[in-house]
Amino acid sequence: MRKILKLFLPIIMCLSITFTSTAQPKDSFISEEVQEICVKYGEEYGICPELLMAMIEKESSGRPDVENGGCKGLMQISDRWHKDRMKRLGVTDIYDPDGNIHVGADYLAELFEKYEDVGIVLAVYHGERNAETKTELSDYADWILTRSAELERMNGK
């Protein structure tokens, strides 16, 4: 009996850890309006809306008025670096949630086209050094992908 217990105890422990780590996350604090915008541009650019929502949670905690080091709004867009993109997309107010997410999704789509690997795309978006040559997933990318998966589960995907 003890041999059987010793054999199955590690398996039971691993299963309990696995099921505990996949428990439902707390509700997203992203507003319904922002979620709808993420769905709109997710569909337009072929990007998972939950990925956009996870990025917004990480970049700005869902606050459209945030500014950090010249990066602004929900997706922390630099109007200095994305001036041409903003003009092309007709975005005049980078703090406007629709315009900010539009610019962010357009930039992400460009990065996906160039790099294809979501880990590299997120690292480049985040401005990490040597992002194109990294072989390991950055902490930023890992957080975004984990949260995106949680949001997908919350949305029944």
Regions from the language model: what does each represent?
Residues 54, 74-76, 121:
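Structural recognition of the beta-strand scaffold that forms the well-ordered cores
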